[in-house]
Structures are given as structure tokens and as C-alpha cells.
């Protein structure tokens, strides 16, 4: 039975309840009702009319309702990533199926108060009809597994053609002018089989530890170049993998073999916005977890790239460039330096390229991430020239970060013909309620018209997209995912998206990051602890000296500590945590609250949203007289100090709280858990997957302050009765991180993904040429005019 049939049957059987429910919605004096509003209306109706299981099941599938007499337009999500649209007349109660376009057009009319003129409809759907796609929602985010199975099955169903494609792919690889794998680039499968047999026979007679340099003369005579292995054992292992594929190909064997090919030695990573540096930047505007993520990421990737190249006998030092914006007015940061080596790496560098105006003038000051769109096209051209010079050639992979970095990655990938990977970190669209339909009201402040257009361009251009969690793509049974919100939406008078992204596209892959294991390790490891930092930490938390950028003094220092650390912005919701703490006498009696974030003086911030949150913090502390129970540190901590602070809080049997209204992933959560600190984190976003509730931490609803305060208070009271409760959650957190969230696992997966997508792009024509033409037109006719208009407004 379809959803519309369900509603029709429900109306026949429970006409009074359906009519009463619709009447309640229409009299709510709101045209747009959210999921929570629709469910609240149902609960009230059930009190009057009794409960209908069928009606309840229907309403609990609703995501949104638009009510303008006499019609109710409804958006339903019967399954993850699958949507239906319908309307029902408030008097006749006969449901009718709608197209996406009809639903969005009605929504626009209701919001604007008048019929909308014809606008551009954006539809990427037709371009992907012939492309392999997943069918089950549970498989979303496992794209490379599906793609490898699907395409290897098709490829090797034509054995000769498949073998030829594979050999052609192996024959084109070279690094710094050095030919790899095959020296003669033979496509004759029979000749290659003979070469492999002869090589393996020879290798059997040698000591397995014989290095490649001694093998090279004989291997060269047989047609083999470096890349098979660093010694005889590894060469034989790699050659046997290829022989197995030629004999009886399978997706797993192909993936294992491709992971051995030394095809990634130069990596370009893009992160334009904010203050990207290694010191004195965290907490500055638009500068937070993404910087930490990338710096930890490149350390792991460089090591993985180096180890793989060495294992395959390729004596080349890999190079990684992180490209960001050069800011001449950089304060006490290094963001005005063109080139900076990344500490802990051998050949990884931060390359800074300035934003320039059309006349070539360099822009000296920081620019909000919401206002950088006019500068990215010129920036991309400058980056292309400087990055190629630094790398000594084309990169093997381009990784974009956030909306701006992904757009620049799109421009560069198109020009250079290089595999493109996108990492969104956080898509703004799900952070701001109705930010698409009311985009015009937000335009002066956030310029979402540019950002959402850039997002559509980048996500449809990418060869593969990496996310930290499943929810980031497709949400949960209850709520839509970040990428899912781009499937269909409307920006009145601009364009209407009826198919923006396909969540079942195999480009989506979940690869979760970790915490730096050298910095964030268990509190119970005394030999690695930085004991010399303890006096400084105690001074930060307990000292009432006036020379610190702090407010509040903890009158009772023996209480356990509730700790939080984040930027001061509305979404991070630190003021929400302070408010729920202030409103709970029980929680205030059990624990003190320690906050690290933002500035104490709003005049020291240049970010308007941060300034608002600073004022709100002071207001809450004044109103609730919190100065003896809350310690607020308006400062940035270096990594070692932050790591030891987590462990010090754990020593005191405290907890970490992450109260964000939404969190795409949550690196601070991983850091806290890796330190053994019990963690309470928002249920909205990635933390719902990271934390196993009541096993490795706790989920909280930041919109339910009283319930959150009670949950935390219950935990502290249980610990007083049974200290083993704290130990149980602490150990659960450590186990969870070790099994799922480490940078070593991340780097291994990223390198495998890049090789597989590079291979399939080469052998099967995954260029999506038609889509690229459409995207090119969309960029020039839609994004560029929006960016130019913004340039004249700011």
C-alpha cells in the first residue's frame, strides 16, 4: 500500500480524527509546520479523538506541512532518503499525489503571498540515469564497495577487454619521470602472463629480503619497472595478486591489488576561509575544528603515502600542499607567510595565496566565510599556477574542504583533469531553519544564494565525497541528512531544485577521522602525561588572578567539573549549556562548570555572531549569579595543554559536554573520549553515531535543557553511590575510539578510495561529461552573477 493509499484508507476509517487534525493545523496561524509541530498536533488530537495506529504512522512520516486554506501540502519521508509529496483538501479529505515541483511551487506562493513567476528548475537526475547506483538505504555511504563490485563484474564479463584496460592503466603510471610497473607498456595479456610467470620463477630462487635495487636489472629485462615491491617477497606478493585477477577476477582481489599501486605521491588540499595556521588561530573567526582536522589528516596521510611508496619500492618522498588564503593583516598568527612547513611532517606544507580584486590589488583583511564567494575564481587561477610550481607537476588527488574549498577543488579538477574528493565538514543549509525558502531575508548577512549554489556545483562535480558519518549523508529515521536537504528545495525568485543530489550515488563514502593519538591519550597513562602542565591548568581553572582573560571563580574547588570547549557561536550553543546549568539548582550543587571559548570582552572580537554570544554569556552569569560556580576562559589553548586539560578533568571525575544545536561530526568529542572523559553530546548530527548511549557516553537534546540537566545530575549522583559507573563509561569511550576513530584507519581508507576511484575513472569513463556541461552552464549563468552582485554589495 502506498503512502497516499494509507492516508485515503485512514480518512475513510477515521474521518473525524483526520478532519480534527487538519483543522488544528489550519488554526495554528502558521503556514509552515515542522515535524515537531505536526506531531504535537497529533498528540493533542489523540486526546480528543482517541489513537489511530494508521494515522499515527502516517503523521510520524511527515517532515513538513504547508497550510493555506483550503489545501494542506505535505512532505513525507516514508524511508531514509526517500520522499513523497501530496496534498489534501480540508473539507473533501481526498489526498492527491504531487510532483516535487508542484509542492515547491505551492510553498513559494505561500511564503511570498503571491503567485511566483516562472523560475529556473535545476534537475541533475537525467544525467545519472545510466550510471550505477545503490538501491538500499543501508548501503548509502559505502559507494566504493558497491562501485567496485558493479564495475568489476561488468568489466571482467568481457575478459579480454577487461584485462587490456587493467594493463593499460598499469602502464601509464610514472612518478617524477620514473616509469612504474611496466617498462614496455605492453597490452598483450598473453605476453604479460609469460612475463609474470618468468619473474615469479626467478623470485622463488632468491632470498625474500633481496632488495629491489638488486632485482632491478633482471626485472627490467622481463619488462617490469619499480612499483611491485621493495624486496623479493613483496614483489612476488604483488605479482601473485595480479595473476589471481587475471585468472579469476573478484572485487576484493582487485581492491587489494589497486591498494598496492604507487599512484598517489602528490596531494593538493584546499581550505580557503578563516585563519589557517598551526599556532594562535583556534578560536579566531571561522577557525576551529576544520583546521585541526586537516592538520591531523595530513600527518596521517603523509605517513601512509610514504609507507605505501616505500613498501612498493618507489624511492620518492610524497608531498602534500594545504592551500589556504594569505592574510596580510594576520595579527599574531603566521597567516601572512606564503609557505609554512607542517610540524610533524617531512614534506607537507601550507601554501598561502592571497585574495585579489579584479584589478590585482591584494585584500589585506580577514573576510567572513559567508562573503568570500566573489574572490574564489581569481583565487583558483592563482592557486593553479602556484600549486603546480610547488608540486612540480599535477597533483594526483585534489581534496576540497567546506563549501568554498570544494568549489575551488571543482574549478581546479576541471582544469587539470585530476580526481576530486569533497569533504563538507558542515553544510550550512541544515543549520539555519528555512534558510532556503527565506534566503532573501538572510541574504545581507549570510549570502546563502552563493553558498547553496556552490554546494550544488561541488557535490555534483566530485568524483567521490567523504563524510564522517552516515547521518551527514542521509540522516536518521527521524531527521533528514545534510546532503539529503539538497535533494529538493526552493529559493524563490532564484531557482527551484527538483533533483539536486542523489544519495544513492556511489560517490558517497563514510571515512571517520580520529584524534591525534600523540596529544589525546588516556588519563590513566602516567608515563605519557605532561605533569609539568598541571600547575598551569590548576591556575587556569581555580586562580582568581586578574591577569587572565577569564570570568568567574570556583568557590568550591572539590566539586567535579563539567567541561566544554568550542567557538562562541549560536550553533555551538555554549550559552545554552550555561542556561540549563543555571536553571538547575540540583546540578549546580553537584558540579562546577568550566568553559573554554571565545573572548571575555566583546570588543576583542571582530565576528558579530560571537559578539552576540559574548553579551549573552555575561547576561546569564549576571542574572543567575554564576560567578562562584562557572569559570569562563576566553582564550585559546595549545594542543598539549588542551590534551592535558581533558585528562585533568578526568582525574577529577568530571565530564565533557558538547551541547551544539547541530554538529556534523565533533572532533572535540573524539578528543574527550580518547582521553577517557565521559562525554555528553548533542543527538543532532554525528555524535549520535559516535557515542553509544549509556555505553560510551550519553546523547542529549540541547532543546530540552531541563532533561539534559537532570541526565547529567543523575550521572554525578550515581557516581557518588558507585564510582565504578564513571569508570564504565570512561572505558567504553576509550574502546569506542580505538575501534572506529583513529587517523591510521582514516588514512588507509582514504588512500584506497583514491586509487579505486582513479582506476574506475580511467578505465570506464566515469567522467560524467554531460553533467559537467550542465554544471559549467550553471556556474557561469547562476553562480558567477550571484558572486559578482555580492562583490558590489560588500
From Swiss-Prot:
Q: Which Pfam families match?
A: Glycos_transf_1, GT-B_Sucrose_synth, SUS_EPBD, SUS_N
The main enzyme category here is transferase
Q: Which UniProt keywords apply?
A: Glycosyltransferase, Transferase
Q: What is the effect of changing residue 663 to A?
A: 430-fold decrease in Vmax for UDP-glucose, 185-fold decrease for ADP-glucose
Q: Which InterPro entries match?
A: Glyco_trans_1 (IPR001296), Sucrose_synth_GT-B1 (IPR000368), Sucrose_synthase_pln/cyn (IPR012820), SUS_EPBD (IPR056736), SUS_N (IPR056735)
Q: Which residue ranges run through the membrane?
A: none
Q: Which Gene3D superfamilies match?
A: 1.20.120.1230, 3.10.450.330, Glycogen Phosphorylase B
GO function terms (MF aspect) = sucrose synthase activity
Description of how activity is regulated? Inhibited by GDP over 10 mM and by over 2 mM MgCl(2).
Q: What reaction does this catalyse?
A: an NDP-alpha-D-glucose + D-fructose = a ribonucleoside 5'-diphosphate + sucrose + H(+); ADP-alpha-D-glucose + D-fructose = sucrose + ADP + H(+)
Q: Where is this region: GT-B glycosyltransferase?
A: 263-742
Description of pH dependence = Optimum pH is 5.0.
Q: Which NCBIfam families match?
A: sucr_synth
Whom does it interact with, and what assembly results?
Answer: Homotetramer.
Q: What function is annotated for this protein?
A: Catalyzes the reversible conversion of sucrose and a nucleotide disphosphate (NDP) into fructose and NDP-glucose; although the reaction is freely reversible in vitro, the physiological reaction seems to be sucrose cleavage. Unlike characterized plant enzymes prefers ADP as a cosubstrate, whereas plants prefer UDP. The KM for sucrose is 8-fold lower in the presence of ADP than UDP. Its preference for ADP over UDP suggests it may directly link sucrose and glycogen metabolism.
Q: List the protein's name.
A: Sucrose synthase
The organism named in the record is Nitrosomonas europaea (strain ATCC 19718 / CIP 103999 / KCTC 2705 / NBRC 14298)
Amino acid at each position: 500500500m502506498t503512502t497516499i493509499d494509507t492516508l485515503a484508507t485512514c480518512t475513510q476509517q477515521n474521518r473525524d480524527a483526520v478532519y480534527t487534525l487538519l483543522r488544528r493545523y489550519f488554526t495554528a496561524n502558521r503556514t509552515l509546520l515542522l515535524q515537531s509541530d505536526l506531531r504535537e498536533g497529533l498528540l493533542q488530537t489523540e486526546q480528543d479523538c482517541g489513537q489511530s495506529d494508521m494515522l499515527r504512522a502516517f503523521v510520524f512520516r511527515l517532515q513538513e506541512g504547508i497550510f493555506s486554506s483550503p489545501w494542506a501540502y505535505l512532505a513525507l519521508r516514508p524511508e531514509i532518503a526517500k520522499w513523497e509529496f501530496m496534498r489534501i483538501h480540508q473539507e473533501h479529505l481526498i489526498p492527491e499525489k504531487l510532483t516535487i515541483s508542484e509542492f515547491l511551487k505551492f510553498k513559494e506562493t505561500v511564503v511570498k503571498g503571491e503567485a511566483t513567476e516562472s523560475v529556473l528548475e535545476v534537475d541533475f537526475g537525467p544525467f545519472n540515469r545510466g550510471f550505477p547506483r545503490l538501491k538500499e538505504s543501508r548501503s548509502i555511504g559505502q559507494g566504493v564497495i558497491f562501485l567496485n563490485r558493479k564495475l568489476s563484474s561488468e568489466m571482467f564479463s568481457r575478459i579480454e577487454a577487461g584485462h587490456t584496460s587493467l594493463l593499460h592503466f598499469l602502464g601509464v603510471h610514472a612518478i617524477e619521470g620514473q616509469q612504474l610497473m611496466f617498462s614496455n607498456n605492453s597490452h598483450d595479456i598473453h605476453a604479460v602472463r609469460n612475463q609474470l610467470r618468468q619473474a615469479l620463477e626467478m623470485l622463488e630462487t632468491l632470498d625474500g629480503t633481496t632488495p629491489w635495487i638488486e632485482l632491478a636489472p633482471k626485472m627490467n629485462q622481463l619488462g617490469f619497472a619499480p612499483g611491485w615491491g621493495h624486496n623479493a617477497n613483496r614483489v612476488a606478493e604483488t605479482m601473485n595478486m595480479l595473476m589471481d585477477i587475471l585468472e579469476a577476477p573478484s572485487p576484493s582481489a582487485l581492491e587489494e591489488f589497486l591498494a598496492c599501486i604507487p599512484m598517489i605521491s602528490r596531494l593538493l588540499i584546499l581550505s580557503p576561509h578563516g585563519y589557517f595556521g598551526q599556532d594562535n588561530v583556534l578560536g579566531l573567526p571561522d577557525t576551529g575544528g576544520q583546521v585541526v582536522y586537516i592538520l591531523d589528516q595530513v600527518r596521517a596521510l603523509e605517513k601512509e603515502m610514504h609507507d605505501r611508496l616505500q613498501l612498493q619500492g618507489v624511492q620518492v618522498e610524497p608531498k602534500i600542499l594545504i592551500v589556504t588564503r594569505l592574510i596580510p593583516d594576520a595579527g599574531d598568527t603566521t597567516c601572512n607567510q606564503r609557505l609554512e612547513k607542517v610540524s610533524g611532517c617531512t614534506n607537507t606544507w601550507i601554501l598561502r595565496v592571497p585574495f585579489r580584486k579584479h584589478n590585482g590589488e591584494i585584500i589585506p583583511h580577514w573576510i567572513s566565510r559567508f562573503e568570500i564567494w566573489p574572490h574564489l575564481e581569481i583565487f583558483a587561477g592563482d592557486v593553479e599556477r602556484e600549486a603546480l610550481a610547488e608540486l612540480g607537476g599535477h597533483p594526483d588527488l585534489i581534496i576540497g574542504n567546506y563549501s568554498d574549498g570544494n568549489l575551488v577543488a571543482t574549478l581546479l579538477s576541471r582544469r587539470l583533469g585530476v580526481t576530486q574528493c569533497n569533504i563538507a565538514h558542515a553544510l550550512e543549509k541544515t543549520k539555519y531553519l528555512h534558510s532556503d525558502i527565506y534566503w532573501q531575508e538572510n541574504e545581507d548577512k549570510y549570502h546563502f544564494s552563493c553558498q547553496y549554489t556552490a554546494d550544488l556545483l561541488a557535490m555534483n562535480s566530485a568524483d567521490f565525497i567523504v563524510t564522517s558519518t552516515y547521518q551527514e549523508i542521509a540522516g536518521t529515521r527521524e531527521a533528514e541528512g545534510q546532503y539529503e536537504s539538497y535533494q529538493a528545495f526552493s529559493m524563490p525568485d532564484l531557482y527551484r531544485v527538483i533533483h539536486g543530489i542523489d544519495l544513492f550515488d556511489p560517490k558517497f563514502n563514510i571515512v571517520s577521522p580520529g584524534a591525534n593519538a600523540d596529544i589525546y591519550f588516556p588519563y590513566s597513562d602516567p608515563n605519557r602525561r605532561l605533569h609539568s602542565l598541571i600547575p598551569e591548568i590548576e591556575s587556569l581553572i581555580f586562580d582568581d588572578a586578574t591577569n587572565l582573560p577569564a570570568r568567574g571563580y570556583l568557590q568550591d574547588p572539590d566539586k567535579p567539573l563539567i567541561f566544554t570547549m568550542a567557538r562562541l557561536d549560536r550553533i555551538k550553543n555554549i550559552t545554552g549549556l550555561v542556561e540549563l546549568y543555571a536553571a538547575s539548582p540540583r546540578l549546580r550543587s553537584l558540579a562546577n562548570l568550566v568553559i573554554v571559548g571565545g573572548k571575555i570582552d566583546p570588543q576583542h572580537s571582530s565576528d558579530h555572531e560571537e559578539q552576540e554570544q559574548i553579551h549573552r554569556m555575561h547576561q546569564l552569569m549576571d542574572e543567575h549569579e554564576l560567578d562562584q560556580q562557572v569559570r569562563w576562559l576566553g582564550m585559546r589553548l595549545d594542543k598539549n595543554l588542551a590534551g592535558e586539560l581533558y585528562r585533568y578533568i578526568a582525574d577529577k571525575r568530571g565530564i565533557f559536554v558538547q551541547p551544539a544545536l547541530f554538529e556534523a561530526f565533533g572532533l572535540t568529542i573524539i578528543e574527550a573520549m580518547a582521553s577517557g572523559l565521559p562525554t555528553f553530546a548533542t543527538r543532532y548530527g554525528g555524535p549520535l553515531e559516535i557515542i553509544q548511549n549509556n555505553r560510551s557516553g550519553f546523547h542529549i537534546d540541547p532543546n530540552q535543557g531541563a532533561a539534559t540537566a537532570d541526565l547529567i545530575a543523575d550521572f554525578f549522583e550515581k557516581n557518588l553511590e558507585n564510582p565504578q559507573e564513571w569508570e564504565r563509561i570512561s572505558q567504553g569511550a576509550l574502546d569506542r575510539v580505538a575501534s572506529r576513530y583513529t587517523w591510521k584507519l582514516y588514512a588507509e581508507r582514504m588512500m584506497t578510495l583514491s586509487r579505486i576511484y582513479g582506476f574506475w575513472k580511467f578505465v570506464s569513463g566515469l567522467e560524467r561529461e554531460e553533467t559537467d556541461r550542465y554544471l559549467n552552464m550553471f556556474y557561469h549563468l547562476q553562480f558567477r552573477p550571484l558572486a559578482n552582485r555580492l562583490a558590489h554589495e560588500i
